[in-house]
């Protein structure tokens, strides 16, 4: 069945197929890809140390992509549902003051990716009033965004 949102953080992050797909995609086009955000699993930072870092810095987008302009890129993956934590959205709102944010979303059900500007993600959330859930390991609340909505969105 694979990894799900019910698995521990350590298991969820052990192998991130969405980041693999993002790197493959950006390395195949004419752009510069720079790893930017903190990767707790590969940084050597303990969970205790990681929690001492201010939230907005912990939630730094994963990459900078430079083509005709610079974008901060947040990579997200899932099967049928994209889960976006409420607190992460607060941080992304702050990051947009410095650089536009683009989401690279990979669905294992669709077996494809879509790039969608952060503003479109927020519009989808507000337009559809998606239900929320909580991660069992940390009780953090998240929106449940159907991948179908992301992949059929023509403006993203």
For each predicted feature, which ranges?
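Active-site metal-binding core of divalent-cation-utilizing nuclease and nuclease-like domains
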Residues: 3-12, 35-69
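Intrinsically disordered, low-complexity terminal regions enriched in charged/polar residues
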Residues: 115-156
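Conserved catalytic cores of phosphodiester-cleaving nucleases, focusing on short active-site segments
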Residues: 26, 61-79
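A short, highly charged nucleic-acid-interacting micro-segment common to nuclease
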Residues: 1-24, 29
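Active-site-adjacent loop/helix micro-motif of nuclease/hydrolase catalytic cores
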Residues: 79-89
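Positions that flank functional sites
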Residues: 41-42, 80, 111
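Nucleic-acid nuclease catalytic cores
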Residues: 93-124
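A structural signal for short, well-ordered beta-strand segments and their strand-loop junctions
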Residues: 34-35, 72-74, 102-106
């Amino acid at each position: 069945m694979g990894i799900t949102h019910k698995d521990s953080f350590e298991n969820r992050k052990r192998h991130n197929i969405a980041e693999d797909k993002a790197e493959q995609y950006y390395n195949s086009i004419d752009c510069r890809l720079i790893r930017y955000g903190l990767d707790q699993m590969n940084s050597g930072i303990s969970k205790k140390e990681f929690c001492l870092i201010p939230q907005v810095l912990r939630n730094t987008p994963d990459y900078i992509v430079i083509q005709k302009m610079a974008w901060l890129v947040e990579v997200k993956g899932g099967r049928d549902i994209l889960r976006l934590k409420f607190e992460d959205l607060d941080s992304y709102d702050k990051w947009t003051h410095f650089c536009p944010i683009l989401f690279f979303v990979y669905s294992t059900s669709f077996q494809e990716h879509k790039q969608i500007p952060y503003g479109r993600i927020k519009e989808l959330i507000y337009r559809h009033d998606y239900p929320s859930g909580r991660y069992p390991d940390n009780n953090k609340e998240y929106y449940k965004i159907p991948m179908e909505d992301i992949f059929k969105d023509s403006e993203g």
